[in-house]
UniProtKB/Swiss-Prot annotation:
Keywords: Cytoplasm, Hydrolase, Metal-binding, Nuclease, Nucleus. GO terms for cellular component: cytoplasm; nucleus. It is found in: Nucleus; Cytoplasm. The gene is harbi1. This is Putative nuclease HARBI1. Belongs to the HARBI1 family.
Amino acid sequence: MALSIAILDCDLLLHGRGHKTLDRFDIETVSDDFLLNTFGFPREFIYYLVELLKDSLLRRTQRSRAISPDVQILAALGFYTSGSFQSKMGDAIGISQASMSRCVSNVTKALIEKAPEFIGFTRDEATKQQFKDEFYRIAGIPNVTGVVDCAHIAIKAPNADDSSYVNKKGFHSINCQLVCDARGLLLSAETHWPGSLTDRAVFKQSNVAKLFEEQENDDEGWLLGDNRYPLKKWLMTPVQSPESPADYRYNLAHTTTHEIVDRTFRAIQTRFRCLDGAKGYLQYSPEKCSHIIQACCVLHNISLQSGLDAWTFERTEATDQSGEDIDPSDTDDPEALRVRQELIQNHFS
């Protein structure tokens, strides 16, 4: 499928003086390297996004001289992957900064509409077992269906004097909770929590906690969380004060397995540079920042399901936990302690 994208002089459109068609951008004339460097993805993936989102984008831009879905998607990808409206991508497709902003908004909304299709826990028993098998092969922990963690994405201070977004390191952020499988595919992405909330507080209020609390069958599987999370029958955390060799072996296996979600955060932030703070914080309201983060999560899953490597763009530094203290309360749930001890005895003794 060849895309010949007619580029419009959007500044003329903005001022109502008509429009003109500039030189066509023919995606077939550029290399995958050019597309990767400019828009972050190869041509076949861009073709797929156009087909996936074009109906939604056409609904949002029903003006006779609206920017085409093709250009909107390229503009949004350029922003997500560069973190700037002033990147070389602007020259590549010839639209103004104001038009880019509208394109990013339109594509972000279109991607969020698609979120239920690409992010979610499976109900298929065979797929659940596949998840468990893949996690088991990492370090020998059975029955794991997902790993959960939070990380902070920096945002500008809200217009209102709202301290709820100030985290323990003193900057404004959104605390994002992700759950992923062993491949880094997101099963849940809650990207709207104020930065002042601890990981434990986010988890307690999250849809994931409600989902697992309501499950009727204890054999559905476990999540793995670090010591910032509460120990539950369905949420296994490390032993905070290991005593036996089995405890140490379990903790090592837990750390190795749980690292998948941290790697996923790093890969997302590195592929989508608008989230990593290198070119400044996200300059939008908390709600719009949340939407942009969610859109990047959807793109992450779409790319993974399309065969792209989740770890291609992974950086090495740790994700930002914003100085949160480790939760010392291992004794909240005696039944959860029993379940974890049985796990350790049966598989790590």
